[in-house]
């Protein structure tokens, strides 16, 4: 597990560049945009297409974009998108997420969307790549080269960029006031410092990793935005530590996954904030007790002000803004 930390500090610290230059005179600005505010106001449905970690960043985007814009969002694996004949048209926006901008399945999804007259907005890290060239608008993540074997800083940069897309849509559609957009943008700016504070716990994280280095299987569970984070955590463990791992929505444990839990199995719990998420937080505490009763060893990742989870918590994250 501790292998997951190799190079992560260097990679993640660069993600703050994603925000640079995207908030000018109180407005969200995209890098290359051939979509007017009027075009964005006409959007009736949004598809997010991506693969791997980019797909998980899209799952996170769904929560924010729907909340901020009240436009329905579907998340699709790019490799499946064009084969199921999705309903697309001029009032559909397809957000294509790709670190390289050359992901073959995502590129084909973009081409299919364009053939159906849908609008396409690319979220990409590589200037001049094929996907942004074939899209109507582009938001570059400016995360620099991805050095790690697995996507680390690219994932965080994509999450931030997707939130910027949501804010740009909300701004154009008038579903968020300018001062609300500014507040959320400032909270995104503060993310870099909060990531730094988590990285300051590297020694503790390595210690936890060493405790479970002999494990053959880990489960990750989360609710709401914690569910995509659980999926991403499991993917990272598979890619970097070569350990079998699966991510699940915590509410689905009783529908099958709990049968996998046996004595000593590590279960990583993404604990929601107790602020404004009291119901979800209470349910996650119940999930922790549920897996512990079946012999699991829990690794709970929680906010540093979460007193209710303190007896279960090994790693504390830092409070984030809620909008």
Give residue spans per PLM region.
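Gly/Ser/Thr-rich helix-start
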Residues: 51-53, 59, 102, 223-225, ...
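Active-site phosphate/pyrophosphate-binding segments
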Residues: 13, 17-47, 116, 127, ...
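Glycine-rich phosphate-binding loops that contact phosphosugars or nucleotide phosphates
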Residues: 3, 41-190, 271-278, 282-312
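Histidine-centered active-site/metal-ligand motif
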Residues: 56, 244, 255, 314, ...
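Single conserved hydrophobic/aromatic residue that forms the stacking wall/gate
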Residues: 1-7, 314-317, 321-323
């Amino acid at each position: 597990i501790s292998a997951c930390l190799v190079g992560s500090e260097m990679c993640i610290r660069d993600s703050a560049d994603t925000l640079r230059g995207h908030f000018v005179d109180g407005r969200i600005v995209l890098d290359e945009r051939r979509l007017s505010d009027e075009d964005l106001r006409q959007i009736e449905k949004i598809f997010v297409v991506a693969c791997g970690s980019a797909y998980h960043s899209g799952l996170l985007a769904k929560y924010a974009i729907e909340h901020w814009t009240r436009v329905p969002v579907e998340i699709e694996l790019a490799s499946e998108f064009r084969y199921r004949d999705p309903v697309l048209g001029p009032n559909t926006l397809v957000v294509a997420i790709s670190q390289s901008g050359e992901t073959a399945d995502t590129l084909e999804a973009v081409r299919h969307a364009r053939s159906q007259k849908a609008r396409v907005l690319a979220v990409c890290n590589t200037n001049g790549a094929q996907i942004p060239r074939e899209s109507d608008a582009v938001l570059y993540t400016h995360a620099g080269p991805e050095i790690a074997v697995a996507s680390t800083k690219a994932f965080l940069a994509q999450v931030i960029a997707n939130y910027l897309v949501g804010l740009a849509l909300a701004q154009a559609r008038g579903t968020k006031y300018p001062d609300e957009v500014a507040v959320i943008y400032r909270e995104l700016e503060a993310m870099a410092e909060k990531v730094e504070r988590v990285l300051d716990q590297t020694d503790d994280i390595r210690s936890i990793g060493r405790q479970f280095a002999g494990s053959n299987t880990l489960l990750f569970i989360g609710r709401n935005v914690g569910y995509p984070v659980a999926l991403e955590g499991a993917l990272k463990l598979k890619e970097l530590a070569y350990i079998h791992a699966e991510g699940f929505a915590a509410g689905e444990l009783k529908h099958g996954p709990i049968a996998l839990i046996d004595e000593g199995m590590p279960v990583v719990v993404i604990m929601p904030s107790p602020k404004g998420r009291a119901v979800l937080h209470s349910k996650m505490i119940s999930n922790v007790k549920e897996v512990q009763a079946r012999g699991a060893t829990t690794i709970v990742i929680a906010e540093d002000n979460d007193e209710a989870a303190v007896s279960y918590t090994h790693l504390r994250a830092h409070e984030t803004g809620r909008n």
